[in-house]
Design a protein with these regions (language model features):
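Enzymes that bind and transform nitrogen-containing heteroaromatic metabolites
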Residues: 2-229
Length: 229
């Protein structure tokens, strides 16, 4: 079966956390700016989209805005002069309230990303109607949580997604890791030990990677690992 190549791209503390108060420190701001510039580079160089879980999408883009079937859709279309770059939302129950079918963001790495919703069978039928009305494409897959492998096959076949950035949070990263589909890991490591957050992968089993890139930038470690086959 064919699926996209997956690179998990994250900012992480020295002790492996990806969420928590440390993300609001000056050190993390520096790490984040390196992270976002790498994301822009990946977008320019052959990646077809990024995937995040509902919580991360909500914090970054929809800001907790509820969906409403009665809302008038903003059907302003993206120019179709290039292959779309997808913002893939793993949203099992269908909770994200998008205002239109693409993201507008001041960061060109995320601006004009076409939204693709991935849902489980737990989704409310009205949410599916809401997506249709807003012309937001979707995949429904998996009983309680989303079936990662099947969803990836559909992304590959129906949406032409060949390379995908996996950008958190911990839970969705863990689902991908457990499904054994993480091919590469790209990290910006903040020079801090942090507490009260979640790890890079919430679940999974031991896996071997090899270091393919390593540099130091503004006090952070920037590195890339590829899965050992």
């Amino acid at each position: 079966q064919m699926r996209p190549y997956i690179m998990c791209h994250m900012v992480m503390s020295m002790n492996g956390l990806v969420t928590g108060d440390f993300l609001w420190t000056k050190e993390s701001e520096i790490a984040s700016s390196i992270y976002f510039s790498l994301h822009r580079e990946y977008r320019k160089n052959g990646f077809d989209g990024f995937v995040c879980g509902r919580t991360t999408m909500e914090e970054s883009f929809t800001k907790g805005s509820p969906w409403n079937l009665e809302s008038t859709p903003n059907l302003e279309a993206l120019e179709e002069n290039q292959k779309p770059f997808y913002a893939v939302a793993f949203d099992p129950k269908g909770k994200l309230g998008w205002k239109r079918n693409f993201i507008s963001d001041e960061d060109p790495g995320y601006d004009k990303c076409r939204i693709l919703e991935v849902l489980s069978e737990q989704v409310n039928k009205q949410y599916v109607e809401y997506l249709k009305k807003h012309q937001i494409p979707f995949i429904v897959n998996g009983k309680d949580f989303i079936n990662v492998e099947n969803s990836l096959e559909q992304m590959y076949e129906k949406f032409g997604i060949r390379k995908l950035l996996l950008e958190g949070g911990s839970v969705v990263n863990g689902h991908f890791f457990k499904a054994n589909v993480v091919d590469e890991i790209s990290l910006v490591i903040v020079p801090q030990v942090a507490f009260g957050g979640k790890p890079l992968f919430a679940e999974g089993t031991l896996a071997n990677f090899e270091l393919v890139k390593l540099k130091q930038e503004s006090g952070c470690i920037v590195c890339q690992y590829r899965k050992r086959v």
